[in-house]
Amino acid sequence: MGLHKLPAHLTLFSPAALIATFFGAGLLKPASGTWGSLAALAPGLLIADAYGALGLMLGTVLAYGLGHWASAAWIDGAPNSADEERNADKDPSPIVIDEVAGMWLTLIPLTLFGAALTPLGVAAAFALFRLFDITKPWPVSWADKQLNGATGVMLDDILAGIWAAIVLLAARQFGLI
């Protein structure tokens, strides 16, 4: 296990780096996206417990907005030289605020209509979000390939979260979770 490096124009405690890496979770490797999704669970569950689906919706919107800004600061300020840590500027691995937004979006169906958060439901949400984020079914794959910059970084995970949320809604409807 190692750590990703920050781009030269950011410091560990700069607001853009803290937000983009979700307080450093994205610096862990391998599997930065999994670490970011896991780090999103605790605050997501606290938000869900305190404010329910509406809190998660607002949290998702806030994470998306701040994530878009932080991702743009990360990507736009990076030098143009080749650097495998930046993943060719497309979707740098250390940026995991997109996973946070997608994970919180995925949790929403578990809190609708007064439903209780169960360990099985949370585990299913985590597994489904990671599945759709990694396998990238359409339109997740489209967003990942066609959109550049901060929008591309953020939107593919939102779409993966929507896929996971749809499956969770169906699983809940059929009493599976």
Positions of the model-derived regions?
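Hydrophobic alpha-helical transmembrane segments
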Residues: 1-89, 93, 100-177
